[in-house]
């Protein structure tokens, strides 16, 4: 079992020459490889895409076997992938998924980091995060619009919709957290983001998500102060330990206008640098003494939350951004760790009630012009949404593609299927140079159960009911998605979430159009269904408006 191979450099093929037997198998092949592109993955030589140890394949032997299997797979066969390892090929039918993926799922009694890490060390499991092991990660862009929408809503609720001259403090510039600086600037606020790894800061600078950096707190604060006074938002990365820096700001009485965090706190061994440790010590001890790392990291997380609570008490809008930091602190004795809310119940849930979430697509041609054309098609088909148009304009101007050109665009029920069918027609008539794939984050309205994040504080108390993502995966399979995934532990760690993903290929065929129409209607409809069942009036109204047949919910 080879987990680390510095000699490997992976990039997705581009153009129209097939390496597999059809676009239905070429697409997962390219997207798997794209997940490990050096400009996409955090540690590609270790197969780590993002989020601590979120991998694309269990080991390099499994990666090679997946690639070879996809190349020979027929269009009436389905490949089964178990925690990043290809385990079977079975005869199904042309409208069945070409790949079915299950990653890091454990029986609830054993669904904890200790048991998972034991399996992981034996080579029996793989942590797939959300889009790492489901082969639809598109770099930091994948989370940037959701982060932008959150910051815009924070500005609307707390500052009358204007973040000019305001600044956000946060931690973490990894694959998810790296979206925060650009999202803040897009929303009109400056951002001070603390990151312990210089390599992560360098990647955000290289890909355009961060404006500048320093290793000196006073210099960082000077840069933030200058940008706020000028009314020109700027993002500053600070090399350091976020728990130390936030405590120092509280001690000095320096108050940010907004406060959150996106360190990989969900994984106390691999995701959070303990206070007083160097990164080199941490990297060594993660292997040699993981229990010592976990103990020290958890203590630091508790201090981190205490500082956040201090600012919350001072009136600073403070929000958990879904990394389970509050839970870790609660388990370390911080009884009021949940005094400030998570971002979904505070800012995003009304969108989920209408099935609106992180719709994304990637151009298999590798040509950025294909994304420009699809951006224009979105504007054409959704002409009366200036907020969406502004997002697309900003994305085109400010977001650098990582790996295959891609776009993230939050749209909901009734729009996703229209866009998918339009993209398929653009492939059919030659407007696009090659097929596109359409997928989404597992962070969506109907595809996740995560009581400390997406399903926190549900109106009916159904936060932990995980039937919904299972039904979502089953329905997407029945509807004809090209690949479907069912994961455990993404975002918030082992024992705290179950979630499902889907990807569908627009190859320009009539058969694809039928699948697209089913999948891209049914997938967001499950989100409306889930929230209607929980009693949200917005979702109930949406379900009635769209004519959903929900017999046990609408009567």
Swiss-Prot record:
Q: In which pathway does it act?
A: Amino-acid degradation; L-histidine degradation into L-glutamate; N-formimidoyl-L-glutamate from L-histidine: step 2/3
Cofactor(s) the protein needs: NAD(+)
- UniProt record, GO biological process: L-histidine catabolic process to glutamate and formamide; L-histidine catabolic process to glutamate and formate
User: Where does the record locate the signal sequence feature?
Assistant: none
Family from the record:
Belongs to the urocanase family.
From which organism does this entry originate?
Stenotrophomonas maltophilia (strain K279a)
Query: What this chain does, per the record?
Result: Catalyzes the conversion of urocanate to 4-imidazolone-5-propionate.
GO MF annotations, alphabetized = urocanate hydratase activity
Q: Catalytic positions?
A: 409
- Entry binding sites for NAD(+): 51-52, 129, 175-177, 195, 262-266, 272-273, 321, 491
Is the keyword Magnesium in the record?
no
The family database entries (InterPro entries) matched by this protein are listed as: Urocanase, Urocanase-like, Urocanase_C, Urocanase_central_sf, Urocanase_CS, Urocanase_N, Urocanase_Rossmann-like, Urocanase_sf
EC numbers: 4.2.1.49
What is a single cellular component term in the Gene Ontology annotation? cytoplasm
> What Pfam families does the database record attribute to this sequence?
Urocanase (PF01175), Urocanase_C (PF17392), Urocanase_N (PF17391)
The molecule here is called Urocanate hydratase
The protein's location, in the record's own words, is: Cytoplasm
Asked if Membrane is a keyword of the record, the answer is no
């Amino acid at each position: 079992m080879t987990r680390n191979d510095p000699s490997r450099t992976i990039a997705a093929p581009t153009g129209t020459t097939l390496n597999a037997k059809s676009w239905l198998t070429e697409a997962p092949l390219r997207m798997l490889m794209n997940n490990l592109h050096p400009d996409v993955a955090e540690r590609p030589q270790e197969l780590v895409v993002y989020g601590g140890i979120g991998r694309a394949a269990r080991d390099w032997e499994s990666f090679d076997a997946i690639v070879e299997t996809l190349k020979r797979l027929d269009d009436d066969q389905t490949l089964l992938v178990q925690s990043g390892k290809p385990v079977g090929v079975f005869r199904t039918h042309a409208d069945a998924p070409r790949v079915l993926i299950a990653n890091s799922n454990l029986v609830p009694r054993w669904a904890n980091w200790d048991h998972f890490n034991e399996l992981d060390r034996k080579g029996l499991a793989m942590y797939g995060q959300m889009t790492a092991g489901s082969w639809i990660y598109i770099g930091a862009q994948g989370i940037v619009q959701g982060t932008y929408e959150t910051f815009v809503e924070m500005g609307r609720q707390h500052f009358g919709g204007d973040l000019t001259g305001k600044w956000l403090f946060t931690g973490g510039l990894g694959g998810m957290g790296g979206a925060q600086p650009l999202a803040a600037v897009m929303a009109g606020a400056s951002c001070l983001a603390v990151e312990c790894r210089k390599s992560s800061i360098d990647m955000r600078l290289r890909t355009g998500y961060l404006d500048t950096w320093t290793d000196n707190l006073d210099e960082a604060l000077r840069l933030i102060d200058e940008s706020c006074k000028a009314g020109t938002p700027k993002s500053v990365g600070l090399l350091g330990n976020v728990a130390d820096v936030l405590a120092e700001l509280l001690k000095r009485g320096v108050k940010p206008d907004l406060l959150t965090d996106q360190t990989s706190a969900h994984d106390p061994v691999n995701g959070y640098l303990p206070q007083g440790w160097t990164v080199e010590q941490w990297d060594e001890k993660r292997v040699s003494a993981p229990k010592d790392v976990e103990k020290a990291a958890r203590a630091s997380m508790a201090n981190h939350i205490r500082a956040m609570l201090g600012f919350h008490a001072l009136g600073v809008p403070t929000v958990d951004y879904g990394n389970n930091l509050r839970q870790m602190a609660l388990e370390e004795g911080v009884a009021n760790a949940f005094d400030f809310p998570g971002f979904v119940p505070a800012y995003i849930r009304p969108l989920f009630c209408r099935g609106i979430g992180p719709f994304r697509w990637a151009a298999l041609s590798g040509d950025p012009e294909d994304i420009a054309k699809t951006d224009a098609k979105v504007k054409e088909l959704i002409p009366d949404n200036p907020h969406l148009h502004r997002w697309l304009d900003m994305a085109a101007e400010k977001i650098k593609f990582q790996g295959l050109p891609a776009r993230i665009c939050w749209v909901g029920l009734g729009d996703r299927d229209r866009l998918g069918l339009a993209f398929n027609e653009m492939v059919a008539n030659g407007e696009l140079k090659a097929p596109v794939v359409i997928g989404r984050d597992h962070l969506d309205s109907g595809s996740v159960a995560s009581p400390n994040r997406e399903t926190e504080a549900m109106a009916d108390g159904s936060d932990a009911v995980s039937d919904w993502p299972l039904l979502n995966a089953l329905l997407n399979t029945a509807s004809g998605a090209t690949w479907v995934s069912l994961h455990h532990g993404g975002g918030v760690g082992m024992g705290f979430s179950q979630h499902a993903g889907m990807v569908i290929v627009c190859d320009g065929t009539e058969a694809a159009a039928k699948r697209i129409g089913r999948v891209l209607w049914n997938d967001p409809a499950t989100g409306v269904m889930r929230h209607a069942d929980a009693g949200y009036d917005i979702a109930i109204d949406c379900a009635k408006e769209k004519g959903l047949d929900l017999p046990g919910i609408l009567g």
